[in-house]
């Protein structure tokens, strides 16, 4: 699966650290399981019981009496604990470094993937949602690896080392521990299967609850104006009740699992004592062996009782894993196509072009040419496909037939390379919570203050900036000044012209600008001789006579020509005259 490969590739820079982590884990768990054995031999030596270990017997033979064995054993225990503490400290540092690098690499790969998604996938999924969801999902996976993976690794290693030691003691005592552990494992598997759909439903219910709360806050003015508060409260209670019901099922399941497993753990120790007393009475095992058996049994079974929490984290992790895998399945833009282009001839040619969106033909049989430095306006009624036409030009939609920029066929080019030569200004203003100057400098950081003032004056924005206390250093957005929609659109125009491109597209970019400023800006742009093609999408068809060429979209077809020529088309003439009546001829 794609996310699995991405996770593995995100860990490749930490191979050495992972190896160190595993080696330290082996050392820690081995010494942890060997400490009870040292105590066992210590007890058995003091009680004059049989010690079936050649190395320990040799070690004991070095001392003249038992009392001299006591401080040496204590030193050995403290030294072992010291090694465990030091190894644990180094392992923690190593793990944190692995997690830090892994989290950074994984988020970087996912963010890079999101940035390169096709326009269709961006359209279906909000960028903010994609980034936020992927960040949350990465955090879930990282938290599982950081907190639970170490626990699982230690558990596996403890079982391996402990079973080896128990096998040397007594098989009957080992059976009690093994049976108790198997019952807990079976219960854990049952819990895993039962909790999986509950956790998935819980996440879904929590998301619905969050969405409802967010909608209520976002639309609070609308609800107040229309007295919808009580209805919204009812809907909120319904969503909250659904969330509560799912949570209640989870609580019942957790309570049952924990009750059974804790009962098994509590029953296990008395059972071992009873069996041990018979074995001890018959001289089969020693007191030290009983201690070791109980110690190991409690270590293993108590570790398994925490398996429910691990499995809950695992289920949550799997939900995130699936979501990230679905994210990575989204289509990327064609990175393998030619991206080493520089458009010298900005002639745009549509020849027998058909544009489809989600399988539906929006525009068909498009045939027209836009020459360099030509001022073109694209008009048509709402929904006629004006924006789709030019978004296809920059690679947002697929098409049949031919659409060329100069000698290059658009569908054969890398989308990023196309957009390096085309500037698309949308109706929405995309600004950052920075100063006005910083927003203007995003494309060209080295632009000078006089150049900013000159461009701002060109787009009738400088006089507005002068009214702010901090001028171009005024912060916009949160805790800053509030720009009107028209001011935002003018700021975006200034920013775009810090780095003009061979083809400039204005997709209803003046919609919020007042009529006087709109006329001044349009006159400035139309009189600007900078060898760039300028294409305007607008509902203001009354502006058509100002342009070199008009492309009129109607019922999926396109007509192109000068204003006087298109007046022969009845639909165009009707649309033009209707708009002219609304605004008055003095605006034209």
Region locations from a protein language model:
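Transmembrane helices of ABC transporter permease
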Residues: 17-30, 77, 83, 150-201, ...
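Transmembrane helix-loop-helix hairpins at lipid-water interfaces of multipass membrane proteins
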Residues: 18-87, 167-172, 284-287
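Juxtamembrane loop-to-helix connectors within ABC transporter transmembrane domains
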Residues: 95, 115-159
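ABC ATPase nucleotide-binding domain helical subdomain, centered on the C-loop/LSGGQ "ABC signature"
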Residues: 108, 326, 402-404, 412, ...
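Loop segments that connect adjacent transmembrane helices in multi-pass transporters
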Residues: 123-128, 201-251, 321
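Cytosolic ends of transmembrane helices, especially the final helix of ABC transmembrane type-1 domains
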Residues: 205, 224, 228, 252, ...
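Helix-to-loop junction immediately C-terminal to a conserved catalytic motif
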Residues: 393-395
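C-terminal portion of ABC ATPase nucleotide-binding domains
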Residues: 523, 527, 531, 545-588
């Amino acid at each position: 699966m794609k996310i699995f490969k991405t996770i593995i590739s995100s860990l490749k820079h930490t191979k050495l650290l992972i190896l160190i982590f595993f080696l330290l884990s082996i050392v820690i768990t081995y010494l942890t399981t060997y400490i009870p054995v040292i105590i066992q031999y210590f007890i058995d030596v003091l009680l004059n019981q049989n010690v079936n270990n050649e190395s320990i017997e040799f070690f004991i033979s070095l001392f003249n009496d038992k009392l001299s064995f006591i401080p040496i054993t204590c030193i050995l225990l403290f030294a072992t604990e010291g090694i465990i503490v030091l190894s644990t400290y180094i392992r923690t540092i190593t793990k944190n470094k692995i997690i830090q690098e892994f989290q950074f690499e994984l988020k970087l790969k996912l963010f890079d993937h999101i940035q390169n998604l096709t326009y269709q996938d961006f359209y279906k999924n909000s960028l903010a949602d994609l980034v936020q969801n992927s960040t949350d999902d990465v955090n879930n996976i990282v938290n599982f690896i950081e907190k639970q993976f170490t626990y699982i690794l230690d558990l596996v290693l403890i079982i391996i080392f402990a079973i080896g030691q128990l096998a040397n003691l007594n098989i009957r005592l080992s059976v009690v521990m093994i049976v108790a552990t198997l019952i807990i494992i079976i219960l854990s598997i049952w819990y895993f299967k039962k909790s999986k759909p509950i956790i998935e439903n819980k996440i879904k219910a929590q998301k619905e609850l969050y969405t409802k709360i967010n909608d209520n806050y976002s639309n609070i003015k609308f609800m107040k104006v229309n007295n919808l508060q009580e209805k919204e409260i009812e809907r909120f209670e319904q969503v909250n009740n659904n969330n509560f019901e799912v949570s209640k099922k989870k609580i019942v399941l957790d309570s049952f699992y924990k009750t059974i497993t804790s009962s098994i753990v509590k029953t296990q120790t008395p059972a071992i004592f009873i069996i041990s007393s018979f074995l001890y009475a018959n001289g089969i095992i020693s007191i030290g062996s009983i201690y070791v058996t109980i110690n190991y049994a409690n270590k293993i079974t108590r570790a398994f009782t925490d398996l429910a929490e691990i499995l809950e984290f695992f289920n949550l992790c799997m939900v995130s894993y699936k979501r990230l895998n679905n994210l990575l399945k989204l289509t990327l833009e064609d990175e393998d196509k030619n991206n080493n282009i520089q458009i010298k001839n900005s002639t745009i040619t549509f020849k027998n072009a058909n544009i489809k969106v989600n399988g539906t033909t929006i525009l068909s049989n498009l045939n027209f040419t836009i020459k360099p430095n030509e001022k073109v306006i694209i008009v048509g009624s709402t929904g006629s496909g004006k924006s789709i036409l030019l978004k296809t030009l920059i690679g947002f939609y697929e098409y049949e037939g031919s659409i060329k920029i100069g000698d290059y066929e658009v569908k054969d080019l890398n989308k990023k390379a196309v957009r390096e030569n085309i500037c698309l200004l949308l109706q929405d203003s995309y600004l950052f919570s920075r100063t006005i100057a910083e927003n203007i400098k995003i494309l060209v950081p080295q632009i000078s203050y006089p150049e900013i003032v000159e461009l701002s004056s060109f787009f009738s924005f400088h006089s507005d900036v002068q009214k702010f206390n901090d001028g171009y250093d005024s912060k916009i957005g949160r805790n800053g000044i509030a720009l009107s929609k028209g001011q935002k659109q003018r700021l975006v125009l200034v920013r775009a012209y810090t780095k003009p491109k061979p083809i400039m597209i204005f997709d209803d970019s003046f919609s919020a600008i007042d009529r006087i400023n709109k006329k001044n800006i349009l006159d400035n742009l139309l009189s600007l001789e900078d060898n760039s093609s300028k294409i305007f999408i607008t509902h203001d068809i009354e502006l058509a006579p100002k342009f070199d060429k008009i492309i009129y979209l109607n019922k999926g077809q396109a007509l192109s020509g000068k204003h006087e020529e298109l007046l022969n088309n009845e639909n165009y003439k009707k649309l033009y005259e209707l708009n002219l009546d609304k605004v008055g001829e003095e605006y034209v």
